[in-house]
Amino acid sequence: MNNKIALYCRSGFEKECAAEITTKAAQLEIFGFARVKENSGYVLFECYQLEDADRLIREVPFRELIFARQMMVVGELLKDLPPEDRVSPIVGMLTGVVEKAGELRVEVADTNESKELLKFCRKLTVPLRNAMREQKILSARENPHRPVVHVFFIASGCCYVGYSYSNNNSPFYMGIPRLKFPSDAPSRSTLKLEEAFHVFIPADEWEERLASGMHAVDLGACPGGWTYQLVQRSMMVQAIDNGLMAQSLMDTGQVTHHRVDGFKYEPTRSNIYWLVCDMVEKPAKVTQLIIKWLVNGWCREAIFNLKLPMKKRFEVVSENLEMIDEQLKENGINAHIQAKQLYHDREEVTVHVRRIWSGVPGRRDERF
């Protein structure tokens, strides 16, 4: 019975992922219950009605899920797959369920234990793909516009089999973008901002919204991991931090370093497009800082991190996003708000806010 959905998430954030999908499902009047195993890297949500699982992965916008890396319909757990023929039972599960899917992904959860299965998954992929093409479960060639077949192994002989829709899923294997750490970047945090650009900004809009010559501000910049990404895109950056910036960034001539507390700095320029911020501080304090920048029209788009407490993490994120939405609306500002726990995030989520227009005349950003 395909009345379940599986969601991949960061290990340790299963409860948050479960709370989020339960909330989203209830908003669609879809009811069920989540099965959570701590530190497993995935969550199962079982719907009471058979057809609701498919409806859920169609109607819950994947881009709005904060803690889920992938979302798919799955059937019952296939157990004790025979070592001499693991392919046939998997193909049998999909017969009559999926036709001419565009891609096959044989995956595991993102945990140290599961990673030991990755070599096995790669080895199984080719014979499985061939068998699925023979049975017309997969199309003869990969097609990005067709559903994706997922074979999700939780142990060597146990897997869930299912599908996702290519217009409402993560395009990445295991839901993880493969980014390479640049050897000249001052810190690994640079990958957070690079991933955020991939997740929040459509590729066909990069030229317009991540354009050469733009002005940007990085609050809490040192040593310059996030500034590095802006410099690489030929932006002019105001780096705000009492600490030291990497000399390699200063040598570019694109960075002006202000030794000021990020919470106290106020810009003198009126043409700042990007604000980025990765400061270790309570979420509500960072949220209020970003709201101040947006309400004053000091920037057009912002990407920032919210460091999460040990408990009530889903509630804290929800409250802060609601706070942004409410206060911007109170000030006559329409904005597009997104949030995601990125692969390169740890105990935090990354938020993106884009001002669409202002109902209050004379704001700085209306003069862009």
Curated annotation (Swiss-Prot):
InterPro entries: RlmM_FDX (IPR040739), RlmM_THUMP-like (IPR048646), RNA_MeTrfase_FtsJ_dom (IPR002877), rRNA_MeTrfase_M (IPR011224), SAM-dependent_MTases_sf (IPR029063). It is an enzyme of class 2 (transferase). The active site is at K307 (proton acceptor). It catalyses: cytidine(2498) in 23S rRNA + S-adenosyl-L-methionine = 2'-O-methylcytidine(2498) in 23S rRNA + S-adenosyl-L-homocysteine + H(+). It is found in: Cytoplasm. GO terms for cellular component: cytoplasm. The keyword Transferase applies. It comes from the Bacteria. Its EC number is 2.1.1.186. Keywords: Cytoplasm, Methyltransferase, rRNA processing, S-adenosyl-L-methionine, Transferase. One of its GO terms (biological process) is methylation. S-adenosyl-L-methionine binds at S189, C222, P223, G224, G225, D241, D261, D278. Its main location: cytoplasm. It holds the Pfam family RlmM_FDX. GO terms for molecular function: S-adenosylmethionine-dependent methyltransferase activity. PANTHER family: RIBOSOMAL RNA LARGE SUBUNIT METHYLTRANSFERASE M, RIBOSOMAL RNA METHYLTRANSFERASE FTSJ DOMAIN-CONTAINING PROTEIN. Catalyzes the 2'-O-methylation at nucleotide C2498 in 23S rRNA. HAMAP family: 23SrRNA_methyltr_M. Monomer. Belongs to the class I-like SAM-binding methyltransferase superfamily. RNA methyltransferase RlmE family. RlmM subfamily. This is Ribosomal RNA large subunit methyltransferase M. It comes from Yersinia enterocolitica serotype O:8 / biotype 1B (strain NCTC 13174 / 8081).
